[in-house]
C-alpha cells in the first residue's frame, strides 16, 4: 500500500511535506511513524519535490496527505492481530484444562474465540481502510481537473475509456469490503440447548477477513 501510495503521489506531483519526520514526532503512533519513514525512503530520489520549492499548491487531497495516518492505523490494527494470534498459538485452549502437577482439572472457557474474533474484525476494518484510500487516489488520478493528467489516463480521452473501468471495478470491491468490515464478533447465536449461549463467530471473522484481503490486494 505504501509503494502504491508513493507512486500515486509522484503521478500527482504531490507534496512531500506530510511525510516530514516532525509531523509524526508530535503524534507518534507507531504505524504512522513507520509509514512516514517508509514514504521518505520510497520518495528519496524523487524529482517532484523540487517542483514544490516555489509552488502555490499547499495541500493535496486527504488520500495523499494522510497516508501515514491511515496506512499507519491499519498497520497498528494488523500488528494487534499478529500479537493476538501468536499468544493464542502458544496457549492452552482445551476444556477441561488438566494441571497434572496439581492433579487437578478445571472446566472453564479458554476455548471461547472472542479474544481472536475481535482482533480479526479490527483487522478487517484496517484492510477496508487500505482499499478505500487506494481507490480514492485512483479516482483522483483519472480525474483531469484534480490531477492535471488526461482523463482516465489515456492519450485519447473521449475516444478511449482508458482506466475508467479499473476505477469502477475498484469502487465495487471497496464497497463489498465495507460489508466485510462489519464485525462478526458482535453477533452470536445460541446452540446446544442453550448450554452454548454465547459464541464468538471467530471462524466467520477469519473467512471474511480473507476475502477482504483479496479484494484490497486487487484494488491496490
Question: Which residues does each predicted region cover?
Answer:
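P-loop NTPase catalytic cores that bind/hydrolyze ATP
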Residues: 5
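Accessory "access/gating" subregions that flank catalytic or transport cores
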Residues: 9-132
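C-terminal catalytic subdomain
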Residues: 114-219
Amino acid at each position: 500500500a505504501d509503494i502504491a501510495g508513493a507512486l500515486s503521489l509522484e503521478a500527482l506531483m504531490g507534496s512531500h511535506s506530510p511525510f516530514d519526520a516532525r509531523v509524526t514526532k508530535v503524534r507518534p503512533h507507531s504505524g504512522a511513524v513507520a509509514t512516514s519513514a517508509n514514504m521518505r525512503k520510497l520518495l528519496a530520489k524523487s524529482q517532484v519535490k523540487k517542483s514544490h520549492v516555489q509552488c502555490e499548491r499547499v495541500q493535496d487531497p486527504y488520500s495523499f496527505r494522510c497516508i501515514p495516518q491511515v496506512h499507519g492505523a491499519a498497520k497498528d490494527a494488523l500488528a494487534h492481530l499478529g500479537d493476538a494470534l501468536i499468544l493464542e498459538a502458544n496457549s492452552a485452549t482445551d476444556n477441561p484444562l488438566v494441571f497434572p502437577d496439581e492433579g487437578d482439572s478445571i472446566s472453564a472457557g479458554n476455548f471461547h474465540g472472542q479474544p481472536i474474533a475481535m482482533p480479526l474484525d479490527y483487522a478487517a476494518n484496517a484492510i477496508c481502510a487500505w482499499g478505500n484510500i487506494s481507490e480514492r487516489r485512483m479516482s483522483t488520478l483519472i480525474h483531469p481537473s484534480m490531477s492535471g493528467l488526461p482523463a482516465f489516463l489515456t492519450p485519447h480521452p473521449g475516444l478511449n475509456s482508458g482506466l475508467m473501468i479499473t476505477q469502477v471495478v475498484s469502487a465495487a470491491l471497496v464497497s463489498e469490503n465495507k460489508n466485510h468490515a462489519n464485525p462478526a464478533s458482535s453477533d452470536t447465536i445460541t446452540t446446544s440447548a442453550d448450554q452454548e449461549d454465547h459464541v464468538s463467530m471467530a471462524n466467520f471473522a477469519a473467512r471474511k477477513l480473507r476475502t477482504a484481503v483479496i479484494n484490497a490486494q486487487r484494488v491496490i
